[in-house]
């Protein structure tokens, strides 16, 4: 298929330019925006109390789903390029993007990704899989984008496969 790269390339572009810039000009319903914000805050409060969930900077939380096989496995820096498998979903379980579904991991320069990933991924060891809980202000904020409503908390499953300096 000559255009098999199209969807991964578009996803990479969206992540590179940042989630917050992807929804220019969309004006969601103010009541829905407020309800989403409230639901997201309640979700993060609930998740923060679950076993194994740890706090990160800026109101994010994470849970190690698969630890690194090597306790001394390297961690990337923001200047590195990372190879990851990931799935992004809403708090209701709706998947909005998945390299797992495409069957092909993504390779990104970390410094070009959204802030949530620039903060979280350097904390991961090569070989780990995390579930990352991202407050709306580190995602799309108060703007909707495609299937993602405004003020949505995002949940990412991220597997750090490789690090390239």
Please give the residue ranges for each predicted region.
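Cross-family detector of peptidyl-prolyl cis-trans isomerase
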Residues: 2-165
């Amino acid at each position: 298929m000559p255009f098999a790269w199209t969807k991964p390339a578009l996803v990479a572009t969206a992540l590179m330019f940042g989630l917050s810039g992807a929804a220019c000009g969309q004006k969601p319903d103010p009541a829905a925006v407020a309800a989403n914000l409230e639901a997201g805050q309640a979700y993060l409060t609930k998740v923060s109390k679950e076993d194994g969930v740890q706090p990160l900077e800026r109101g994010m939380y994470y849970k190690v789903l698969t630890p690194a096989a090597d306790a001394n496995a390297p961690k990337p820096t923001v200047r590195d390029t990372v190879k990851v498998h990931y799935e992004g979903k809403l708090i209701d379980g709706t998947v909005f993007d998945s390299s797992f579904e495409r069957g092909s991991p993504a390779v990104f320069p970390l410094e070009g990704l959204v802030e949530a990933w620039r903060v979280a991924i350097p904390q991961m060891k090569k070989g780990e899989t995390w579930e990352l809980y991202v407050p709306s202000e580190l995602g799309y904020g108060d703007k909707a984008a495609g299937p993602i409503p405004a003020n949505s908390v995002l949940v990412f499953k991220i597997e750090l496969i490789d690090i390239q300096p």
